[in-house]
Amino acid sequence: MVQTEIQKNFSHMNDMQKQAVFCTEGPLLILAGAGSGKTTVLVNRIAYILQCELCKPWQILAITFTNKAAGELKERICAAVPEGGADIWAATFHSTCARILRRYGDRIGYTSHFTVYGTDDQKKLVKDILKQLNIAEKTLPVKSILSEISKAKDKMLTPEEMRKEAEFDSRKAQIAKVYEIYQTKLKTADAMDFDDMLCNTVKLFETAPDILDYYRNQFKYIMVDEYQDCLLYTSPSPRDRSVSR
């Protein structure tokens, strides 16, 4: 079936939605308010791409931000594309990164069975480190430390880089020290926190260009729902022709 014939299947959409759905080359950014049908456009665009046989289902990566949203997205894709919809990578950033790291984490020093630390695990680890350093929790609350570590990872800062940023800020220098020990203990335990899953995937791609090329070649289309919530390190390069947002 030619593309013009396939496009008739999307007559229920308005002109702007059709324009987005039928755009299959180069970057695409959709700006619209809540409830305007952005996710519907994403699902229909995937359906259109597959109906036109522009790629295989497993060559599409659809990213969203919560497990609930990812589950709903997967359901809507499978309903729109009964054949092959289940093969599309529809997931959160974290689950996508975990999937990649389970396969290739050994390239950066992790086993395929690495542990993911949740909030309780993180708090316990930081408390142990504070005891090790003889720092009272009242002067340096665990919650504040974890918040600062997370902010550092958002900016892809290592403990050493965080220490340099601290300059004459003794409190931040202490947190940088905790951060350093925290990362060492995580690595020794073959563990990561949720921020690490993102950072380590970036690290993997930076240090193993063959793996980056593998996924770059696999995914012909990368679509991100709620793109405005992306951090710098989770933003796909606009130079990649597969990116649509």
For the regions a language model picked out, list residue spans one by one.
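Conserved small/polar residues in nucleotide/adenosyl-binding loops
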Residues: 233-240
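N-terminal pre-P-loop "Q-motif" helix
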Residues: 10-24
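Hydrophobic alpha-helical segments, chiefly the membrane-spanning helices
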Residues: 244-245
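A basic/glycine-biased coupling hinge at the interface between accessory DNA-binding modules
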Residues: 2-8, 25-28, 36, 47-221, ...
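Walker A/P-loop
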Residues: 39
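The Walker A (P-loop) glycine that initiates the GxxxxGKT/S ATP-binding motif of P-loop NTPases
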Residues: 32
